[in-house]
């Protein structure tokens, strides 16, 4: 192709509603990112105020781009041409390579999309804009292009220098590298949450605009994409269409099956360049690398704890120096961080602005309400891809994943015991120090952990927030409810390795094993 005039109409693609529905969520996200980034590049190069095309407005709002008429793009390019000599502006080699032509955008979406498809014949694409064959190749001509052939040959020329993962398209590598750099350039103006990809921001913004959200009728969980809802609904109906031919284990999502099959093949494609350790999942490699990166970054000279950023280290230093600049005027208690003071003051004011609509219970923090509501809905949004176990809290998932990885990087200097999480080490060390900082105001009993105090206080209040949906029996502790529910389900997860007898509770198994240990 001749390297001459490149305008927005050359780097944009029209879709009808019918064609847009044929794309999966991955292809749609890539389309949004490519078009928005190209538009941003063109505007920055033009250096002037240009009326924004409707397709860009819709994409920024998370709406469907097929609603745009072609006349809008024509109006925008005429506006640009009237202000600048665009041929001179965009004819340079670097500019041309940065701004993809229209067929290249289509080609990229196709080649990336084929990785997610079972067969290339399933991809529903056709050219919409009527152009000459020289400027806009047809679908048949695209199949002969080198980049499109990469999707069949599995050629991935763009490799990440950090972890070695390779990609077929440069843009995918750019997105991926933000995982290592931590860059999240796209920020939501409503809530301040930041994202690595523009498409992720667009999808997130639908939560605020309530534009075409998909709600699960079983548990009320909200999705911004219909395909995500369909996959989620398999949890409720128990559908697991993807079965492992080796062991018969079935999965809801094809990606879970692919990961599982590596157990049988022994494949560990993700290798750490620092120590050579290999992992089955990329997420496990990333977690492992964070520990290595932390060792090289900001380390506390007092206790050796490492941080990825200097601000985290500065906050941590206050633990050792005892600096607590934010003091409560009511009781004199001081805090290291202003946010801690704000939350603490609600104890004195009694403010609990977050109330549960199911049971009326109120909370001083929105996060506590969110966690509480999952008791009623049964929602456990965080899934372990190794064993398909679900968790209500992300921290519980991270803690659990350490079981599969087998890493315990935090070692107690007193007794040598190692832990997966730094918080676990901190809790453990209080055993050696004899520290019990959490006191019950009712009976003066002290506890090492805040969670222990919270559980204990329910004895005085009589509160039993965890009720069984089968028989209505209520419990103080969630763990007690889980044990009770096994009576109804018949589940006995703890099996004796000697005689294969199974038990509902681990304590029952421990007691039983004494029979075999008697000499």
From Swiss-Prot:
SUPFAM superfamilies noted in UniProt: beta-beta-alpha zinc fingers, KRAB domain (Kruppel-associated box)
PROSITE patterns, per database record: KRAB, ZINC_FINGER_C2H2_1, ZINC_FINGER_C2H2_2
Compartments in which it is found: Nucleus
Gene Ontology CC entries for this record: nucleus
Post-translational modification Asymmetric dimethylarginine, affected residues: 75
Domain KRAB, first and last residues per copy: 6-78
ZnF (C2H2-type) ranges: 158-180, 186-208, 214-236, 242-264, 270-292, 298-320, 326-348, 354-376, 382-404, 410-432, 438-460, 466-488, 494-516
Main location: nucleus
Entry-linked Pfam families: KRAB, zf-C2H2
Keywords per UniProt: DNA-binding, Isopeptide bond, Metal-binding, Methylation, Nucleus, Repeat, Transcription, Transcription regulation, Ubl conjugation, Zinc, Zinc-finger
Any one Gene Ontology BP term: regulation of transcription by RNA polymerase II
Superkingdom classification of source: Eukaryota
Record GO terms (molecular function): DNA-binding transcription factor activity, RNA polymerase II-specific; RNA polymerase II cis-regulatory region sequence-specific DNA binding; zinc ion binding
Crosslink position(s): Glycyl lysine isopeptide (Lys-Gly) (interchain with G-Cter in SUMO2): 110, 141
Role of this protein: May be involved in transcriptional regulation.
Similarity comment: Belongs to the krueppel C2H2-type zinc-finger protein family.
Record protein name field: Zinc finger protein 30 homolog
Species whose genome carries this gene: Homo sapiens (Human)
Gene responsible for this protein: ZFP30
């Amino acid at each position: 192709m001749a390297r001459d005039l490149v305008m927005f109409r050359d780097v944009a693609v029209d879709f009808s509603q019918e064609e847009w529905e044929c794309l999966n969520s991955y292809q749609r996200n890539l389309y949004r990112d490519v078009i928005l980034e190209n538009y941003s590049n063109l505007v920055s190069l033009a250096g002037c105020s240009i009326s924004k095309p409707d397709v860009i407005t819709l994409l920024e709002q998370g709406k469907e781009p097929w609603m745009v008429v072609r006349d809008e793009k024509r109006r925008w390019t005429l506006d640009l041409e009237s202000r600048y000599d665009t041929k001179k502006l965009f004819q340079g080699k670097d500019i041309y390579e940065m701004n993809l032509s229209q067929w290249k955008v289509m080609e990229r979406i196709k080649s990336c999309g084929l990785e997610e498809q079972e067969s290339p014949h399933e991809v529903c694409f056709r050219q919409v804009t009527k152009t000459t064959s020289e400027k806009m190749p047809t679908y048949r001509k695209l199949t002969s292009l080198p980049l499109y052939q990469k999707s069949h040959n599995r050629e991935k020329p763009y490799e990440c220098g950090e972890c070695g993962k390779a990609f077929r398209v440069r843009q995918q590598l750019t997105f991926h590298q933000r995982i290592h750099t931590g860059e999240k350039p796209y920020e939501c103006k409503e809530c301040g949450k930041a994202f690595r990809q523009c498409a992720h921001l667009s999808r997130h913004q639908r939560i605020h605009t309530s534009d075409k959200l998909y709600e699960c009728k079983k548990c009320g969980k909200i999705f911004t994409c219909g395909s995500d809802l369909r996959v989620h609904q398999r949890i409720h109906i128990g559908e697991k269409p993807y079965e492992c031919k080796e062991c018969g284990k079935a999965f809801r999502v094809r990606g879970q099956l692919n990961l599982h099959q590596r157990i049988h093949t022994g494949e560990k494609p993700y290798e750490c360049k620092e120590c050579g350790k290999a992992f089955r999942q990329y997420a496990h490699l990333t977690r492992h690398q964070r520990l290595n990166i932390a060792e090289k970054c900001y380390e506390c000279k007092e206790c050796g704890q490492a941080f990825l950023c200097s601000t985290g280290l500065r906050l941590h230093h206050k633990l050792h120096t005892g600096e607590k600049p934010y003091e409560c005027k009511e009781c004199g208690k001081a805090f290291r961080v202003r946010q801690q003071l704000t939350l603490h003051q609600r104890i004195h004011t009694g403010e609990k602005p977050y109330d549960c609509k199911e049971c009326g219970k109120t909370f001083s923090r929105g996060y506590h309400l969110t966690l509480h509501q999952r008791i009623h809905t049964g929602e456990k949004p965080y899934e372990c891809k190794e064993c398909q176990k679900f968790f209500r809290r992300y921290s519980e998932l991270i803690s659990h994943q350490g079981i599969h990885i087998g890493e315990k990087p935090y070692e107690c200097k007193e007794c040598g015991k190692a832990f997966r999480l730094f918080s676990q080490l901190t809790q453990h060390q209080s055993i050696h120090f004899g520290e019990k900082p959490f006191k019950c105001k009712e009976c003066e009993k002290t506890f090492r952990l805040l969670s222990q105090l919270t559980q204990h206080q329910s004895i005085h209040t009589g509160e039993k927030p965890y009720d069984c949906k089968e028989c209505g029996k209520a419990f103080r502790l969630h763990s007690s409810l889980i044990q009770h529910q096994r009576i109804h389900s018949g589940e006995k997860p703890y099996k004796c390795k000697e005689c294969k007898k199974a038990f509902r509770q681990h304590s029952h198994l421990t007691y039983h094993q004494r029979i075999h240990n008697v000499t």
